[in-house]
Each structure stands twice: as structure tokens, then as C-alpha cells.
Amino acid sequence: MKRFFTFLAVALMSVTLTGCYDDSDLWGEIDNLKDQVQANSEDIATLSSLIDALNKGKVITGTEQTENGYKLMFSDGSSLEIKNGTNGADGADGDSFFVSIEETDTTVIITLADGRVITIPKVEIRTLTFEDADVKFTSYAIPGCGYPIEKWSDLIDNPQYGGPLLYNDYSYTGYEWHDAGNTELASGIIDGGAYWNGGHAISNYYMEDFSSASYETQLAVSTGTAEGAGHDGSKNFCVQNGYVDDKSWKTVIPYFYFADNVERVVDHMYVTNTSYAYNSLMNGDGFSTPAGDDTWYKIVATGYDVEGNVTATTEFMLCDGKDKIVNEWTKFDLSCLGKVAKITFNLVGSADLSGDYGLNCPAYFAYDDVAVRF
């Protein structure tokens, strides 16, 4: 691009030296140069976006050939168009920074005009939706259920508290689920006991008026609609109950894991407060006061490899002061945990949310649409 500006400067200087003459050809060249400078500016912006994608750990989930190059679709839902020449031809010096784009089964290889090569991984994203239409697991039984579990909605208990699936007369429930044939993620209730042990339960419950939410509506959220309270208007989602700190009697942090014991990157999922937790943070309850300016409440996600070693930890703020309490499905990036066999999700709160026996705020959050890289 430097030579464009050099030529432009020389051309303009020649005008001052030669005086009056027919300059239409010169201005035509200048207009062409402006177009080339603009094109190179767009290339610089595209290159910056590619570097940013690599730095943020994004991977390509799909490609689409366009008239002038490629459209790349990334794992976070964003896309980027790369022009590598006119009408599909390879880019030439002065035409594009991008000389060629090569696609393999696992990568997209971009060659720049100076010979440098950018290689971006390409993966398949599989999503755990909890929707009946996406079921791939085979039928199975759990002790508290008088019918076979054939679809996700069969795992939704009624009533929400004290029901047969999650409590089974307050004895062993064996409540568990496995997204077999898809993401291979699995979870359930810790030690197979009642839901107060902590764990992950499927739900579709919705409360428009969260002000009456309590432990009896522990599986409800107040985002979406009664027809679709899940992320993006879907019906079903999952609710975690439980946490561990130095005051609680529990020792196992709720988690999900890959049932086939293969390490994978969990790219992201969507989370929100349950109605019960949201009501407590907004209005307080018999155990906890409403959130103040300095109140915080967060999910702490920790990844583990197959040998049980920690890979990394990341956090999501469910409450960051009284004016920032989450009540919409919000993306939680988990890709920074790297390849994991298991992820634990602990709930941690500020001092005003805790008492002599641990958290006073209801230890729940809801999640949906867990995206896994394959």
C-alpha cells in the first residue's frame, strides 16, 4: 500500500510543476488509487479480525464460497468475509492481501501476499439443547419414575419440590441423564440421592411474576414465555442446585462430564438466574437481604482433564450490584477451559449473601444450549 501513496504524492507534485493542462487522466488514476487504498484498508481490517479470532480461541464451524472469496463462520456465531481476488480468481499483488484460501477437513489455510500463512482450526459444533426433537439417547429407567425415560421432558419433575423424580419419597432417586449420540455430556443428582444433594435437573417451568418464587418453584425461570422459557424461545433447559464452601455440609460441587471419557472443548452455554434466586436478589427473603451496590453472585466454572487435573477456571457474574442482576439468557464462554473431561460449577457470593452456615441466597442457576467442539 505504501507505493500507492508514493505514486499519489508524485502525481500531485507534477501538477504544481507543469501548470495548466488536461488533468482528466490524472484524476482518473487518483480515483483508481483511492479505490485500491480503500480495498487495502478493508484487507487490514479483515486481517485484524482474523488475528483477533485466533487470540480469542475461536474456531471455524463452517465456510461458504462467495463471488470474491470466502465467508467464514466462527464458533461464537460471528462471521467474516475474506476477499481473495475478483470474481473468485486468486488474489494478485495490489489486489488483495489474501493470495489464496485452502479448505481441508480440519482447517482453513489462508496465504497472505508476503508468503505468511494463517491456519485456523475448523470443527463441528454439537449442541445439547434438552429439546425432545433432538433426543438421540435410548430409553432407560430411573427408580423414582414409573415410566421409561424416552425424551428430555420425561425428566421434568412435578411438583418441582418433593416430586417422585428428584426426591422419590426422600430416598435414592438415581436421577441422571446422558446426551448419548450427540455431545456425550452427562449429569444428574450427586450420589443418586434427593435433589438437595445438588445436581442438574431438566425443567420447562416459567414464572412471569417472580415475586412469589420460593423453593417450591425451584426449577422455574422468569425469562421468555410460558410456551418457551428456554434460550432462544426453546421449551426445555437445565437447573443446577448446589454449591460447596467451608461452611456447607456438601463436599461435591455439581458438575457435568463426558460420559465416554473423551476430553473436548465446551465452547459456551447460555445461563440465567432462576426465579427463586432472582427474587431473593431483587427483593430478599427470610434468609437473605436484597442485593446492594456491592453485592456480587457468580458461577465459578473449573475444568478437569481425564486424570483429574485442573485445566483452568472462569467465572460468570449472575449479580454485580443491585442494578446488574441477570434475568436474560446470557452467553457464558467456556472455551478458555481448554479440553476437559468434566466441568464443575460452584456458586459463590459476597459477604452480605452469606451467613453462619454458608450461602443465604438460593444456590441455583439455569443453563441451556451447551455447545461442544468435535
Where are these regions (language model features)?
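Positively charged n-region of N-terminal signal peptides that target proteins for export
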Residues: 1-4
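C-terminal motif of bacterial Sec signal peptides marking the signal peptidase cleavage site
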Residues: 15-19
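Collagen/collagen-like triple-helix sequence repeat recognition
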Residues: 21-124
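Short amphipathic beta-strand/extended segments with alternating polar/hydrophobic composition
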Residues: 78-87, 116-124, 129-131, 259, ...
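N-terminal targeting leaders for non-cytosolic proteins
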Residues: 124-252, 261
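Extended extracellular/luminal ectodomain segments enriched in beta-structured repeat modules
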Residues: 261-268, 339-340
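Short coil-to-beta strand junction motifs in C2/discoidin
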Residues: 280-299
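Terminal, low-complexity interaction segments
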Residues: 295-374
